């Protein structure tokens, strides 16, 4: 047989691959239309990216975990220094604390996104942020343990637990640990990290105030500039970091200007945006900086590209360091070279001893970064890799903020004088930091879950009564139907209660009945006057039912959801379809004292396209805000679409406005919204140059037929959403529309029922 590899006169030219290019290299829709609506955000984290399959139950796997053995292995790892990445001071504790902190510290209360709950530090962009240099090594050090325990411990849980064990192995008593973080398998696309196009840029989030970190040769005047800028600048919402690629603040000071007071203002703003008060902020900074060190052995130009830009042979590791050995005493991360205490592997009060025990003068690290050295001090700080050397005490600009800001100073001096209270405050703040995005306590797993209930966990009372049965529900539905409340009142109230849920940090929802409490009862979007009428009526129904003998009761939280279902059933019946809206009792009513008003304030919607509501002054196009709201509600694009169509014809719009109510059968669960939106007999035009509101007129006569908002019209304009709208506008779609609406409605009503999982 002829060797097909042999050359011949006919095949002398080099063989070419017939597939020269792939879709990755081609021009994409986003390149042509950069402002295209991101409907794809509603289809993240599908089973197609999950190797464990849709039947995998992490909670069940976690229960099989030998938790004590896992912790023993983590304790052993802390002092098992590896030649490929030696431990500072012979202990990896500082590195693992930083890893856990930076995993959890991306959380922001504004939209609940970020945080440790999904193990996102493994993926871009977080795995390549400038603030996360060397954390790739920390995760590789954990890999043998992750490999050993497999799917019984998620990466998300392991990263946080490693930080906890690091603290414990250095003599600190933690507040506890809860498992339950479920890994995702691709980067979150819905998180807005900012619009800067350069690492460490801040020009957009502060309105062209900063362009990135700089290190001026002369810092004279830099303090005045930083102070002026930090006084006047406003950080863009919902961001909680001062520069692209940082977790919180620039440790050198605002824009690299070494001004402790200006740094304090940045610290207060960013920590508040992740729900930390001043005491928690001081405890976290001082507690975290009791351990370990920063690394700035040489200038940053010795460091190679981040993991996502690395070559194949680097195997996902980044920041290859060409200086010296590239590790140990030659390590470069932040560019700062600071060890805060004499006991970097042991819990102590040394941070405050040094903070107040010395005067400080400005200096630079070997990498050229601004830091502070103690005046007239002896070299008492251990070297991380040479026991024969001692170093001078050093601090960061952001550390000195705790001394020179008057509020932080008072707290710091109190902690200095009361180390037991400092330890307790740090333990609680650390637990809050690492568990803030986990939602209610019912999601917590493991033997170290603290018994104490904390207000930031949005507690709800346990069920202490006998739940209603099917016969009771029929009687209650009859009472609701006879109460005089209309379909729109029932539906809009239930939606207002349940739709506060955020899949990001698992907060909000109908359980707890907080719609009846401050601040939610007074939110503009919840129509306080109408709400008070509905709640008063439902309370009468509740009181009458609960007055019966025995222990059977219904909460107001349950009754609100049940009443919404009654409204949907009535509207479906008007459309000729008799069905039962799913309802599972078991919600309880929280008390006002169990509700942190300031913590709940960020849950207030400044836009809710499902109710055709946008707060005045909002500049983001409302259709984009609709996608954001739908994503927080964990809705798919079809679910979002059918809910919009249904809520419009049920009269759920805030204020009863007629925009988007494309029907003459208000209160009937019809598919009229889609039929009339897609009617080519209607011609649409904006009412004003702002293009917020549109009129739909008869193409022949010019007569006004409808008015609609951007949210309404996008279901006919956007090609993806129009394709979905066409399904529900078809002649044979009425029953499918109703049943799909009920399924999506029920999903939203039960999003926070983690007790049912």
From Swiss-Prot:
Cross-link (Tryptophyl-tyrosyl-methioninium (Trp-Tyr) (with M-274)): 101-248
Residues forming the catalytic site: 102 (proton acceptor)
Tryptophyl-tyrosyl-methioninium (Tyr-Met) (with W-101) cross-link, chain position(s): 248-274
Keywords associated with the record: Heme, Hydrogen peroxide, Iron, Metal-binding, Oxidoreductase, Peroxidase
Heme listed as a keyword: yes
Main enzyme class: oxidoreductase
Keyword Heme among record annotations: yes
UniProt site positions, description: Transition state stabilizer: 98
InterPro entries: Catalase_peroxidase, Haem_peroxidase, Haem_peroxidase_sf, Peroxidases_AS, Peroxidases_heam-ligand_BS
GO cellular component, one term: cytosol
Catalyzed reactions per annotation: H2O2 + AH2 = A + 2 H2O; 2 H2O2 = O2 + 2 H2O
Region named Disordered: 213-232
GO molecular function, one term: metal ion binding
Cofactor(s) this protein cannot do without: heme b
Any one GO biological process: cellular response to hydrogen peroxide
Domain of life: Bacteria
Positions that bind heme b: 289
PROSITE patterns in the cross-refs: PEROXIDASE_1, PEROXIDASE_2, PEROXIDASE_4
Functional note: Bifunctional enzyme with both catalase and broad-spectrum peroxidase activity.
Subunit field text: Homodimer or homotetramer.
Name of this protein: Catalase-peroxidase
Originating species: Xylella fastidiosa (strain Temecula1 / ATCC 700964)
Taxonomic placement: Bacteria, Pseudomonadati, Pseudomonadota, Gammaproteobacteria, Lysobacterales
